[in-house]
């Protein structure tokens, strides 16, 4: 039934949605149409304002002919289409109407059911009122409110529905008429257009016949319009009256309800306050109240469902109205056909009316004005109605909310309340939306009526148009004013319509949404019901399984504990006899509560034990690792052997214990599969315990855990069973409610279908019996549960004892563990000490190694210095008389340094000796440790052999996991290596740069301070070296510590993670096994949840792993960076040392050349300053000249200015290019950095992806397992399905048989009851004639009908769905009847045939008798023969008698059968009578419809009469306008009278309805009686429940008493057991002593194992440290070897250099002896030069001041020049003889693209374009070859081939690392070789001599480049500001010095050949300062 109702609800929801959608679309169309009408009205009026209408009418005549023909064609086409559509529609509409009638019958049934439900609601409310005290008030209020709502609403809704039906019918009519209007308007527009076009033509001569025809058509159309308008006006007046009445009722009701609700709100608030204050006082009473409120809320839920049903009923009513509307439409169609006939007749008259058509137009204008006014009024009224409706909806919603809030005391019921509120709100919204739509439709109707009135008025005035024309012309002016007003009103109306449209659309959208939500909710409800059913089935299955399991458990427990059970069984038997039926349920409840409490405690204990086990396992794993490590390093073999023996003994004992425990486990394994899984884990644990004591501990814990789990499972099962019982009870109650509902429905439908009701009743009885059976079974289950519970109690008691023992054992073990921990802590402390000593050793060793290194280096330095000293001494001895004082100073300084170094060396040697002693001691201790480790290794190898056999199972699992981890690690390492390589590359680059920069900075510093090296400098260097050494040491230590930390972290983390993964894998395997074995859906779900949780955990673990790996990699990279930095610093140190040596050597030689260089440099600087001054002065002159020329001659200046502009532009372009290049460079840098970042990110992503891949693989494996499980379940389902299919086939077969029997029976019945059939035939005949009458009525436009048909189809489909379910039920019943009748008929036929056979036999026998009589007469003489014959005859007679008796018996049987058949026939007659009642109901409905039709016809007649009255009124108006008002008043009065009549008729209809309702109430009373019966049965149920509760209470009391007795008996038993114990004490004492010994041995073993573990730990730690030290040592050795090789190479190179230098010096010494005298002279000269230099510097200062002044002048001139340039620019634009810039640019670019041989031709071309003569060009080329100035090429940065004339330095590149002193020497040299000074650029353009940019850039230039530079630039290019390399991004045009405040424009400077540039070459790293110095020396 629930599914049927659900289907009905969903169908209704869909139909509602469709109806809403169609209504929305219709209203939208109407609103759009009204807008269009208004717009067109204005256009018409505006078009028809001019007075020249007569001319238009004349022009129209000609056009109307052609137009008339077109209209005729259109009419014919439309008629054909119309006929075709009518033929189609007739068939469809008949079928739909039949179906609608069926639906209406169903609706009546549903209404009856609704009334019954309402009665039930009232009852429930009365029950709710009996709630005591606090809850009483809200309950009563709620009930009262509900009753109120029920009393008021249905009637109102009914009225609404009636009106709604009328609206729908009128809406359809409106749509049709609106289409007609639009068509007519389009025609009017067409005519107007034609009239406008043909105004100019003016066709006066038109045929009179055409005009007449058109006039006829117009008249006919106007008549139609007037009729329709009258009809609609009447309908509208009726509707308005009804609406006004409704509005008043609604407003009154709304006010009343509001006041009620306000009062209720106040009451509820007071109650809430009271409830809040007295919470603490009345807890018990409140609980009771809460229960009551729960019941009330459930009742309210039922009520809400009823409300839903009511709404569904209303929807059905609306469907009814639709059908009535269709009838109206059919009538209208018929009318239309008649009108069409009339139209054809009137077509002839149309010609006469053509002239009058134009005269009617002003009247149309008037009517449009009146129409707009009416529309405005109606819109206002509609808006008022809308407001009222909305208020009502709101009030209803508020009422619902208030009612729910009154029952909101219990927080747990808040959710139900919310749901109810939501549903009610949704329903209210739907209601309000429907009302809005209705009102909108009414508005549209009114508007259309007005329009039709306009058309009607025009039609009626056709007769008196001539007379009105004159009056209308007079009134035109007045009307024009009114027109303006109407236009403004119309605009407002349009706005209102738009707003209404928008509101309507929103409402429709909302309605659709609500319907979707309702349908979704229904679907969800259905799904929930199905799920609950499935759950019930599953729970039942589980109960059976649990019962089986419990039986097994009880059997096993009986076997174990027979003695206790026997003693308890005797007691139980005594008590069970008294307490079987009464105490079971209560006892179960109490025990279950206890079990739940114990469950909770056991769960807690389990959790604690699990944690304990986990800790133990972690300890075990740690100890195992330590053992494995310590196996390689154990000592004390003798002591260990003894320990081993003890341990083996211990292990044997433990094995015995374990065997006993395993037996227990095997018994427990039978209990459940879950327990088996845990036992398997235990077995594994036990195996571990055989080898290690800690594992034994874990095993014991697991045993206790398993026992707890068994207990927990039993308790859980009990809890579940109890829950299932409760649930079953609830389900029974729910089902009882459902059945009650079904009974009510059946009772409603009884009058219609008595046979169906009887069958339903039987079905219900069967169901009740089934339920009783189920209840009995459940009672049995409860009994079984009782017994089970008692047994489980025994089990629990035994398990508790075992637990106690286990806890004692655990305590002992914990004591042992504590002792072991203490020992381990001591060992740990010792280990820490050793590790500290080792660290100290390591540090000392490192220091010693470093000292050794430093010593070696110092020795080598010493040797070198000694050699140098010897050499210097020799030189001094040779050149004693001419020795320098500086050389002597340096010698003394070196000697003092040597002495200091010797002292340092001695100190270092002493330290080394001390450290060596320490290292030897440590080595000895290490050797001892190693020996002990080796001994331990031997012992541990033996142990390992034993372990390997035992751990075979474990190792396999671990190996698999290890392989996975290894693969991961490999991938991680690969990635790390890649990362490391990339980072190393980056770091090496960075280090190179770092080194270079450092070296450069150091070189600069050294260069600057070379000329006064002293003691302080050497000391500073030594200190720096020491500091660097210290830094290196610190960094090394840091690196070592970091590497250690990293290794430790990685090892620990990997270990932990692997352990966690192993645990998780084990758990997953267990779960998989469980999934594969168990078929319980709940278990599967639980396991799936666990799986998900584990997957989450695993993901987290992987995430942690990834993070740790990242950290590792990060730390490693940092370590590598640190190493690189250290290496860089060391390299820098070595370079510094080398440079110091070189400087010391060089300083001695270069001392004498210094003076010369300084003098030369100073003189050169002075010359350069002079040159600059000259250049500036020339520039000033040129500027002045330019200014003069610009001011005087414009013509001459044109070309110059052009050139000037072009050059400036080119400069700007080049600047832009340079900027672009710089930007590009920056972009490239940024992209490189981005690429680096991206690479890092990608690597991280790679790691993440790998981790994800692993996770995915795991998930895949899990999914595969799940998939296999699902496949199995799927196969099972398939088998079930097949079985079901077979059953279905059987059922179908039986149904088919039944159908056959039914057919036969029906045939019989036709013969038996022809009267019935004739009666039944009458109804279909009447229906057919009705259909025929209706089919005649069908005549409307095909498009609208098709749309409506589609809607009807949809509604029919939905209704079909509901009817099908009912039909199926009917079919079943009819099938069963048919089957029985068939069987009876067959039997009857058989009996008939048998009777016939018997009759035939009788005839034969009679004939035989006659023959025998004749024989007797003939042979009477022969006595003998006659006697013999007689005897035979007697025998034959006896046989015949037997046959006759048989026949009689058969006849009796047949009579019985006939009686049965008669009874069945009577039943069938009864069913037919029921059907007759149904047919009568149908006939009544038909009668109603016919009544409706008659009413409609009457209305039509009234409308026609009205029309006539109006026509008379109009005629009277034409005669005289004075009597119009009176006539109108009379008409109004007549209308009112008619409305009164109609209302009376309506009241009569209502009375008839009330009679029907009375009949319904009679039916309801019957239903009420049935309900009373049900109520009594419910009371009986309640009584039985109370009785049960009482019996349970008594049972609990007796159970308690029984427990007390049990306790007493147990005490007696304990006394007996104590006696037994005393007898067995001797045995126990002996065993106790043995156990004590065993425990002592165990303690010893534990102590020994702890010691061993601790030593193993220490060993492992030390091993790790040793490994780390070895690694670091290896690294350091590698580094050392590398350094040594480098140093050797350096030393060899140095030696060779020194040898060469010595040879050179020897030669030089000989030369120098000769030159000493000349040098003294040179010295004198140098002194003189220095004096001159000082003078030159003074001069330089003066010159610089002059230069500054000139610069200022220059700037001023520059400003003037800029102004002049601007003027020139303006002149250049106007001046002639311009050079084509594009051509010049192309030539210029071409010049550089052409090969060097052909460049002269390009230049000649340029010259010819610029107007340079050939002679001048040749001269220029000649000058260019000869080295004359060529500023353009230099300026553009082209490679200059010519040598510039500026004095240059000997080597450009050597300046880089040179100090000021060096530069000074070079300057002196250059001064000694003077050259002609060329004109110079500005001082700002000069780069300073020692600018760092230049230095840096030139350091790395290769020698080859230097040579080329020298060859090109001669001596000195440094001064040139244009020689800045391109790599520095210096613009070629704007030199470094040129700023915004720089000197004048480049073009104004003298054209000089000082602008050569060099393409930058890549710097080579091997270019050191030494090479530069060598070059210097060579030059």
UniProtKB/Swiss-Prot annotation:
Gene Ontology annotations for the cellular component aspect, listed alphabetically: acrosomal membrane; cilium; cis-Golgi network; cytoskeleton; endoplasmic reticulum-Golgi intermediate compartment; endoplasmic reticulum-Golgi intermediate compartment membrane; Golgi apparatus; Golgi membrane
In-chain residues carrying the UniProt-annotated modification Phosphoserine: 464, 1842, 1891
Keywords: Acetylation, Chromosomal rearrangement, Coiled coil, Cytoplasm, Cytoskeleton, Disease variant, Dwarfism, Golgi apparatus, Membrane, Phosphoprotein
Residues marked Breakpoint for translocation to form TRIP11-PDGFRB (site): 1754-1755
All copies of domain GRIP, residue ranges: 1774-1823
Region (Disordered): 1873-1920
PANTHER family: MYOSIN HEAVY CHAIN - RELATED, THYROID RECEPTOR-INTERACTING PROTEIN 11
Record disease entry: A chromosomal aberration involving TRIP11 may be a cause of acute myelogenous leukemia. Translocation t(5;14)(q33;q32) with PDGFRB. The fusion protein may be involved in clonal evolution of leukemia and eosinophilia.
Protein's name in the database: Thyroid receptor-interacting protein 11
């Amino acid at each position: 039934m629930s599914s049927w109702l659900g289907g009905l609800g969903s169908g209704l929801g869909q139909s509602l949605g469709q109806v809403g959608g169609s209504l929305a679309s219709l209203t939208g169309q109407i609103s759009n149409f009204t807008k269009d009408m208004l717009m067109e009205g204005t256009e018409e009026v505006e078009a028809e304002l001019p007075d020249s209408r007569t001319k238009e009418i004349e022009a129209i005549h000609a056009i109307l002919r052609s137009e008339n023909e077109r209209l005729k064609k259109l009419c014919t086409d439309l008629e054909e289409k119309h006929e075709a559509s009518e033929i189609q529609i007739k068939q469809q509409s008949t079928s739909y109407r039949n179906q609608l009638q069926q639906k209406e019958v169903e609706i009546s049934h549903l209404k009856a059911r609704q009334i019954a439900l309402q009665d039930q609601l009232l009852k429930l409310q009365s029950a709710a009122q009996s709630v005591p005290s606090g809850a009483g008030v809200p309950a009563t209020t709620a009930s009262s409110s509900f009753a109120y709502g029920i009393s008021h609403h249905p009637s109102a809704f009914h009225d609404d529905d009636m009106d709604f039906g009328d609206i729908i019918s009128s809406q359809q009519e409106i749509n049709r008429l609106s289409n007609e209007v639009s068509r007519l308007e389009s025609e009017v527009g067409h005519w107007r257009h034609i009239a406008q076009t043909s105004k100019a033509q003016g066709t006066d001569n038109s045929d009179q016949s055409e005009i007449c025809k058109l006039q006829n058509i117009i008249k006919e159309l106007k008549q139609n319009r007037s009729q329709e308008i009258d009809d609609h006006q009447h309908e509208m007046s009726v509707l308005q009256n009804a609406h006004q009445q409704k509005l008043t009722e609604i407003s009154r009701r709304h006010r009343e309800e509001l006041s009620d609700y306000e009062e209720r709100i106040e009451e509820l608030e007071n109650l809430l306050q009271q409830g809040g204050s007295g919470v603490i006082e009345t807890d018990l009473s409140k609980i009771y109240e809460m229960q009551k409120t729960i019941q009330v809320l459930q009742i309210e839920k039922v009520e809400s469902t009823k409300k839903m049903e009511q709404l569904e009923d209303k929807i059905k009513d609306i469907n009814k109205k639709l059908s009535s509307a269709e009838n109206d439409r059919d009538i209208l169609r018929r009318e239309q056909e008649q009108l069409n006939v009339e139209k054809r007749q009137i077509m002839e008259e149309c010609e006469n009316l053509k002239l009058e058509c134009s005269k009617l137009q002003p009247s149309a204008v008037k009517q449009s004005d009146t129409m707009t006014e009416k529309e405005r009024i109606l819109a206002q009224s509609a808006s008022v109605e809308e407001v009222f409706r909305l208020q009502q909806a709101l009030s209803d919603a508020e009422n619902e909310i208030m009612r729910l809030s009154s029952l909101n005391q219990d927080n747990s019921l808040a959710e139900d309340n919310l749901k109810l509120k939501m549903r009610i709100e949704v329903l209210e919204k739907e209601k309000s939306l429907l009302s809005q739509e209705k009102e909108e439709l009414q508005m549209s109707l009114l508007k259309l009526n007005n329009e039709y009135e306009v058309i009607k008025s025009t039609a009626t005035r056709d007769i008196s148009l001539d007379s009105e024309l004159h009056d209308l012309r007079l009134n035109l002016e007045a009307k024009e004013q009114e027109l303006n007003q109407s236009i403004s009103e119309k605009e407002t109306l349009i706005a209102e319509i738009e707003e209404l449209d928008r509101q309507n659309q929103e409402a429709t959208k909302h309605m659709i949404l609500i319907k979707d939500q309702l349908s979704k909710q229904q679907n969800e409800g259905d799904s929930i019901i199905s799920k609950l059913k499935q759950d019930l089935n599953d729970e039942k299955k589980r109960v059976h399984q649990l019962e089986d399991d419990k039986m097994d458990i009880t059997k096993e427990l009986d076997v174990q504990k027979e003695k206790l059970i026997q003693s308890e069984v005797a007691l139980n038997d005594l008590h069970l006899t008294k307490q079987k039926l009464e105490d079971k349920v209560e006892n179960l409840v109490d025990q279950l509560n206890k079990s739940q409490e114990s469950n909770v405690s056991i769960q807690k204990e389990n959790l604690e034990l699990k944690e304990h086990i986990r800790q133990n396992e972690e300890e075990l794993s740690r100890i195992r690792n330590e053992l494995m490590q310590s196996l390689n390093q154990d000592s004390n073999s003798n002591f260990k052997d003894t320990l081993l023996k003890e341990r083996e003994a211990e292990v044997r004992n433990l094995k015995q214990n374990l065997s006993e425990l395993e037996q227990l486990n095997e018994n427990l394994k039978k209990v459940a599969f879950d327990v088996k899984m845990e036992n398997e884990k235990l077995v594994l644990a036990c195996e571990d315990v055989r080898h290690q004591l800690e594992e034994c501990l874990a095993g014991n814990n697991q045993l206790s855990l398993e026992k707890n789990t068994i207990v927990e499972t039993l308790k859980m099962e009990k809890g579940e069973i109890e829950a299932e019982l409760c649930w079953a009870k609830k389900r029974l109650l729910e089902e009882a409610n459902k059945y009650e509902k079904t009974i009510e429905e059946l009772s409603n439908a009884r009058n219609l279908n008595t046979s169906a009701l009887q069958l339903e009743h039987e079905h219900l009885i069967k169901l009740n019996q089934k339920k009783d059976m189920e209840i009995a079974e459940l009672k049995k289950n409860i009994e079984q549960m009782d017994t089970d519970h008692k047994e489980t109690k025994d089990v629990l008691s035994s398990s508790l004892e075992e637990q106690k023992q286990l806890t004692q054992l655990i305590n002992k073990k914990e004591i042992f563990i504590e002792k072991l921990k203490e020992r381990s802590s001591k060992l740990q402390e010792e280990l820490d000490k050793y590790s500290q000593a080792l660290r100290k050793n390591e540090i000392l060793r490192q220091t010693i190694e470093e000292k050794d290194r430093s010593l070696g280096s110092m020795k080598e330095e010493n040797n070198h210095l000694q050699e140098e000293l010897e050499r210097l001494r020799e030189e001094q001895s040779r050149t004693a008389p001419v020795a320098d004082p500086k050389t002597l100073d340096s010698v003394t300084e070196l000697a003092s340094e040597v002495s200091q170094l010797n002292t340092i060396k001695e100190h270092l040697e002493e330290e080394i000796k001390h450290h060596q002693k320490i290292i030897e001691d440590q080595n000895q201790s290490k050797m001892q440790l190693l020996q002990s480790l080796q001994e331990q290794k031997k012992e541990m190898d033996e142990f390992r052999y034993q372990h390997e056999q035992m751990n075979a199972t474990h190792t396999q699992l671990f190996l698999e996991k290890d392989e996975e981890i290894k693969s991961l690690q490999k991938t991680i390492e690969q990635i790390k290596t890649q990362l490391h390589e990339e980072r190393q590359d980056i770091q090496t680059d960075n280090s190179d740069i770092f080194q270079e920069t450092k070296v450069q900075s150091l070189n600069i510093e050294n260069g600057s301070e070379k000329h006064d090296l002293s003691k302080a400098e050497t000391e500073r260097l030594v200190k720096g070296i020491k500091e660097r050494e210290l830094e290196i040491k610190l960094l090394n230590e840091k690196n070592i510590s970091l590497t250690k930390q990293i290794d430790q972290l990685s090892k620990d983390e990997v270990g932990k993670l692997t352990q966690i993964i192993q645990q998780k894998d084990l758990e997953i395997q267990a779960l998989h096994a469980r999934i594969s074995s168990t078929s319980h859906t709940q278990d599967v779900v639980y396991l799936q949840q666990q799986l998900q949780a584990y997957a989450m955990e695993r993901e987290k673990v992987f995430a942690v792993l990834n993070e740790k790996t990242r950290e590792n990699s990060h730390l490693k990279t940092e370590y590598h960076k640190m190493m690189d930095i250290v290496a860089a610093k060391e390299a820098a140190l070595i370079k510094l040392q080398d440079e110091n040596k070189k400087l010391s050597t060089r300083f001695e030689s270069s001392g004498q050349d210094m003076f010369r260089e300084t003098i030369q440099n100073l003189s050169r600087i002075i010359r350069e300053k002079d040159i600059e001054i000259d250049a500036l002065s020339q520039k000033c002159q040129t500027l002045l000249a330019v200014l003069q020329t610009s001011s005087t001659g414009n013509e001459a200046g044109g070309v110059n200015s052009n050139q000037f502009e072009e050059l400036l532009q080119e400069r700007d372009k080049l600047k832009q290019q340079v900027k672009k290049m710089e930007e590009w460079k920056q972009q490239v840098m940024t992209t490189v950095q981005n690429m680096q970042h991206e690479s890092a990110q990608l690597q991280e992503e790679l790691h993440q992806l790998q981790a994800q891949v692993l996770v995915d693989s795991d998930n895949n494996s899990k999914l595969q397992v799940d998939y296999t499980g699902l496949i199995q379940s799927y196969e099972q389902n398939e088998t079930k399905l097949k079985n079901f299919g077979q059953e279905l086939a059987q059922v179908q077969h039986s149904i088919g048989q039944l159908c056959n029997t039914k057919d036969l029976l029906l045939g019989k019945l036709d013969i038996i009851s022809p009267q019935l059939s004739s009666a039944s035939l009458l109804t279909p005949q009447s229906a057919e004639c009705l259909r025929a009458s209706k089919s005649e009525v069908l005549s409307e436009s095909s498009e609208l009908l098709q749309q409506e048909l589609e809607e009807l189809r949809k509604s029919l489909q939905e209704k079909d769905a509901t009817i099908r379910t009912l039909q199926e039920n009917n079919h079943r019943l009819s099938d069963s009847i048919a089957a029985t009748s068939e069987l009876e008929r067959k039997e009857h036929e058989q009996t008939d045939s048998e009777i016939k056979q018997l009759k035939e036999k009788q005839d034969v026998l009679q004939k035989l008798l006659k023959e025998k009589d004749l024989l007797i007469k003939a042979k009477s003489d022969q006595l003998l023969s006659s006697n013999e014959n007689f005897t035979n005859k007697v025998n034959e007679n006896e046989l015949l008698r037997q046959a006759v008796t048989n026949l009689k018996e058969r006849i009796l049987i047949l009579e019985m059968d006939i009686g049965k058949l008669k009874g069945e026939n009577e039943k069938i007659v009864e069913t037919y009578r029921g059907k007759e009642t149904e047919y009568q109901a149908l006939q009544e409905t038909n009668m109603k419809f016919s009544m409706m039709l008659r009413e409609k016809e009457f209305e039509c007649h009234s409308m026609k009469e009205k029309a006539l009255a109006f026509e008379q009124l109009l005629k009277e108006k034409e005669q005289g306008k004075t009597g119009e008002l009176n006539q109108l008043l009379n008409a109004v009065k007549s209308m009112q009278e008619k409305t009164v009549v109609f209302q009376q008729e309506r009241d009569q209809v209502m009375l008839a309805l009330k009679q029907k309702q009375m009949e319904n109430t009679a039916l309801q009373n019957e239903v009420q009686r049935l309900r009373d019966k049900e109520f009594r049965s419910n009371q009986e149920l309640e009584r039985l429940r109370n009785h049960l509760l009482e019996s349970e209470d008594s049972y609990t009391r007796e159970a308690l008493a029984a427990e007390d007795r049990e306790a007493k008996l147990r005490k007696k038993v304990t006394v007996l057991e104590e006696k037994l114990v005393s007898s067995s004490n001797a045995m126990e004492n002996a065993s106790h002593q043995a156990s004590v010994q065993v425990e002592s041995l165990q303690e010893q073993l534990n102590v020994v194992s702890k010691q061993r573990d601790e030593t193993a730990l220490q060993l492992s730690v030390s091993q790790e440290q040793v490994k780390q030290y070895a690694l670091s040592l290896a690294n350091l050795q590698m580094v050392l070897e590398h350094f040594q090789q480098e140093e050797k190479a350096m030393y060899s190179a140095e030696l060779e250099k020194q040898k060469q230098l010595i040879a050179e010096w020897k030669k030089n010494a000989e030369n120098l002896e000769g030159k000493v005298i000349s040098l003294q002279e040179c010295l004198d000269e140098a002194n003189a030069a220095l004096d001159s230099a000082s003078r030159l510097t003074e001069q330089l200062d003066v010159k610089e001041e002059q230069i500054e002044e000139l610069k200022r002048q220059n700037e001023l001139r520059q400003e003037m020049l800029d102004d002049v340039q601007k003027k020139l620019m303006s002149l250049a634009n106007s001046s002639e003889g311009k050079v084509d810039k594009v051509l010049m640019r192309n030539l210029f670019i071409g010049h550089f693209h052409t090969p060097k041989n052909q460049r002269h031709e390009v230049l000649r071309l340029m010259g010819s374009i610029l107007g340079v003569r050939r002679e001048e060009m040749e001269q220029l080329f000649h000058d260019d070859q000869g080295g004359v100035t060529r500023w353009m090429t230099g300026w553009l940065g082209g490679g200059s081939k010519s040598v510039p004339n500026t004095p240059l330095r000997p080597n450009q590149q050597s300046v880089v690392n040179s100090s000021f002193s060096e530069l000074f020497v070079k300057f002196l040299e250059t001064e000694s070789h003077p050259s002609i000074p060329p004109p110079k650029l500005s001082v700002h353009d000069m780069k300073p001599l020692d600018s760092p940019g230049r230095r840096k850039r030139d350091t790395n230039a290769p020698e080859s480049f230097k040579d080329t530079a020298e060859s090109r630039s001669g001596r000195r290019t440094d001064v040139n500001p244009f020689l800045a390399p391109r790599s520095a991004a210096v613009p070629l045009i704007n030199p470094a010095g040129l700023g915004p405040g720089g000197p004048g424009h480049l073009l104004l400077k003298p054209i000089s050949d000082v602008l050569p540039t060099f393409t930058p070459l890549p710097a080579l790293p091997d270019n050191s300062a030494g090479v530069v110095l060598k070059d210097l020396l060579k030059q």
